[in-house]
């Protein structure tokens, strides 16, 4: 049971973290969870715990963003211009530019056509598509070939990013729901035909060993698409393909699911059929 003193220190940590412009819109549940672990690791030393919490947030969130916060307002103005002009090619160019703001989707941009063509060769077009820890991936919807009736359910830990994603999907005419969700704190039992977990498991495992498959097991979808990076943000392989594939396939073999493996660009892809 957390003591009142512990709660006070976590409150202190949360206030210190959210003073930083970089982390002020991160889900409170995420900040408090990392702060709690940092307090234990620092033996109650608050200044040290602040550093540890920021380091943890950088690993799972900050490292994927540019040094300065993206100008989402300006991006939406450019999208408005393209949509109002009825210029589909300009919208696609905007999508590519916007997705390049986030490192995870930037790496996927050169391979978008092949990426979604191959995935949806193995996955039926869903009525409900859920994208967990989505980043800016929902902006790739023009490449997915979804029906007009498909509802895109997207979530991430960054409230500012999710406001932007929701506004962009509205302008793109995509039925959607967006929310701020910490995957290690939230219930994930809402049903969806297909769930995307793109480059998410390594970040989960960094925070809590074994949590990647715990999320997969809990998610209420018959089909889950999981991907892993095969190169670091610095474009080094470091044996990542072998490490991720061996670990993932070993865990999958212990479950009654069927998996299909693909590799496109710097991304190892698994389609899981529960």
Curated annotation (Swiss-Prot):
The enzyme's E.C. designation: 2.1.1.179
Q: Which domain of life is it from?
A: Bacteria
Q: Please give the Gene3D superfamilies that the UniProt record associates with this protein.
A: DNA helicase RuvA subunit, C-terminal domain (1.10.8.10), Vaccinia Virus protein VP39 (3.40.50.150)
Q: Which Pfam families match?
A: FmrO (PF07091)
Query: GO:BP terms for this protein?
Result: response to antibiotic
Q: Which residues form the signal peptide?
A: none
Q: Which InterPro entries match?
A: rRNA_MeTrfase, rRNA_MeTrfase_GmN_bac, SAM-dependent_MTases_sf
Q: Which reactions does this protein catalyse?
A: guanosine(1405) in 16S rRNA + S-adenosyl-L-methionine = N(7)-methylguanosine(1405) in 16S rRNA + S-adenosyl-L-homocysteine
Q: Which GO terms describe its molecular function?
A: rRNA methyltransferase activity
Role description: Specifically methylates the N(7) position of guanine 1405 in 16S rRNA. Confers resistance to aminoglycosides.
> In which family does this protein belong, per the annotation?
Belongs to the methyltransferase superfamily. Aminoglycoside resistance family.
| Name of this protein | 16S rRNA (guanine(1405)-N(7))-methyltransferase
| Organism (species) | Micromonospora rosea
């Amino acid at each position: 049971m957390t003591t009142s003193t512990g709660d006070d220190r976590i409150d202190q940590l949360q206030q210190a973290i959210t003073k930083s412009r970089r982390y002020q819109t991160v889900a409170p549940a995420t900040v408090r969870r990392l702060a709690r672990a940092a307090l234990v690791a620092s033996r109650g030393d608050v200044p040290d715990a602040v550093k540890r919490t920021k380091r943890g947030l950088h690993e799972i969130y900050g490292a994927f963003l540019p040094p300065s916060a993206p100008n989402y307002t300006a991006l939406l103005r450019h999208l408005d211009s393209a949509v109002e002009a009825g210029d589909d090619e300009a919208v696609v160019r905007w999508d590519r530019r916007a997705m390049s703001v986030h490192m995870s989707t930037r790496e996927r941009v050169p391979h978008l056509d092949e990426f979604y063509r191959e995935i949806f060769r193995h996955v039926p077009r869903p009525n409900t598509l859920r994208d967990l820890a989505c980043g800016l991936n929902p902006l790739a919807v023009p490449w997915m070939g979804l029906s007009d009736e498909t509802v895109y359910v997207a979530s991430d830990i960054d409230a500012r990013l999710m406001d932007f994603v929701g506004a962009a999907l509205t302008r793109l005419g995509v039925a959607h729901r967006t929310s701020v969700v910490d995957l290690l704190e939230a219930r994930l039992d809402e049903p969806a035909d297909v769930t995307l977990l793109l480059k998410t498991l390594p970040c989960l495992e960094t925070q809590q060993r074994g949590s990647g498959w715990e999320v997969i097991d809990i998610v209420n979808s018959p089909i889950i698409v999981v991907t892993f990076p095969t190169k670091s943000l610095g474009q080094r392989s470091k044996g990542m393909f072998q490490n991720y594939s061996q670990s993932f396939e070993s865990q999958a073999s212990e479950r009654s699911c069927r998996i299909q493996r693909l590799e496109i660009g710097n991304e190892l892809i698994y389609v899981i059929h529960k």
